[in-house]
Amino acid sequence: MIAPDGTEHFCSRKIHCARCSTRKRSDGGTEYFHAFLGASIVAPGHKQVLPLPREFIAPQDGAAKQDCECNAAKRWLAKHGASVVHLRPVYLGDDLFSHQPLVEAIQRANGSCILTCKPASHKIISEYLYGATLEEHRETTITRGKRTTTVYRWLSGVPLRDGRDALHVSWLSMEILNGKGKRTYYNSFVTDLAVSADTVAELAACDRTRWKSRMRRSMC
């Protein structure tokens, strides 16, 4: 699995260059910063991550809009996707990535994806799920006398956006409940991989693995 994620490595209100990105602050000031898209090979159950080439997020020639993490991800796939295709990569990503243009870029690079999908930023998906009958799978474990129940729910054939050209993916969620039935964790995802009672737990675990990559970069 390959986990790309954006990271800043410089920020200033005074020092800047032509390669800086900018943002306005609430006090009217301008911040100048450098950022890049890092990518690492990760795997559930393994502490180690293997870093891959990075792609800088910086002004692009001829572009009217400021560069962003998603555009950097598309460039990374175009440059490096072919070199990792033999790994049959599954790309992991946060909510910024779970939109059709980037999923299409991943598929053009002969990859698959498992991407975080927040309901608040995906209106079409939320509307499609409303009232739908979801598949469900539960797993209960007892560790040191404490009961934990993990509830997985999923639905296949969900459109990523409105329109006839919409890609259809599978939506899944993972909810962890303690012994009193209180929710201690929840997240939802979209994937172009097949989801079933046999695979849903593994798919959800794969997406959570990308946090290793983020933590490794934060310690560098």
What function would you assign to each model-found segment?
Residues 1-46:
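Active-site-proximal, Lys/Arg-enriched surface segment
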Residues 1-9, 39, 73, 91-96, ...:
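Short, conserved catalytic/metal-binding motifs centered on acidic residues
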Residues 34, 49, 86-88, 110:
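A general structural motif
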